[in-house]
């Protein structure tokens, strides 16, 4: 697969995606990654000497330290399980390609595992890990915080079911491209940021689940989801071109719309402007949301929730730039051509010691 239209020059992602600098936060400790990997080994998902799998999990889970920077170890461990579950199911469904019957069956079984805590296919490690993850969430919440638990399970199920239609909106036909409005509607949920934010209601007990019903907050969260999905598409664009699976990447399929775009630069400008407009919308809506609450303590809780959204936005961007696995063969954007040398994950050398 090749890029359809030629660009004029390398484009800087750090200059193209704009958000307030004060949203950045130093990542928290990443020691939880080893513990998450150990849990997976104990469940038979990975082998202790499987360096390739550890590298993959290490790369995925290192994002947690950036997107949930205020977490202590037990909270970080929960974010690690959350992200690991997300990648496990996403990768498994991708491996099924276009087997509709198998895909639907898998989604139904995982839905049962999330809602009922039961395993339908006794040979499914995915279902086993889903039940393990669900049980850990319930233990963390307890019955006194069942509303937070139900909130997250509900959002996970909704996100789960978007994986199927999302895989159907692309085609390898040369002139086909999906409706961007349709893509954006599904991707708002599919990118998983709404579920990521729902996890905060479990991790941080000061957050009131009633805030989830506030329409202005949900608007902010939806805007954040689209901004993050555009960032992810930009970062993964070259790798997906190389692997010939960029059909659902906006930076790829919008180039096919010759009625709107004649160059790759125009596509980039359009998407960067949309992402930055959504950041401006968030900045505009935040004081309006805070103004809805007269009590000072209530405002502090709302601000805390907004800060968590900030960290999802900034953490995703910074981690994406730093993550070594996303630098390969990227010839379209600068800032992704080489590693900064910063270590963002755990070390393979620590595993043998950890498993003693």
From Swiss-Prot:
GO terms for biological process: terpene biosynthetic process. InterPro entries: Isoprenoid_synthase_dom_sf, Terpene_cyclase-like_2. It comes from Dictyostelium purpureum. Signal peptide: none annotated. Belongs to the terpene synthase family. The gene is TPS10. Contains several highly conserved motifs that are important for catalytic activity including the aspartate-rich 'DDxx(x)D/E' motif and the 'NDxxSxxxD/E' motif, both of which are involved in complexing metal ions to coordinate the binding of the isoprenyl diphosphate substrate in the active site. Keywords: Lyase, Metal-binding. One of its GO terms (molecular function) is metal ion binding. This is Terpene synthase 10. Its EC number is 4.2.3.-. Terpene synthase that converts its substrate farnesyl diphosphate (FPP) into several unidentified sesquiterpenes. TPS10 also converts geranylgeranyl diphosphate (GGPP) into the diterpene beta-araneosene. It catalyses: geranylgeranyl diphosphate = beta-araneosene + diphosphate.
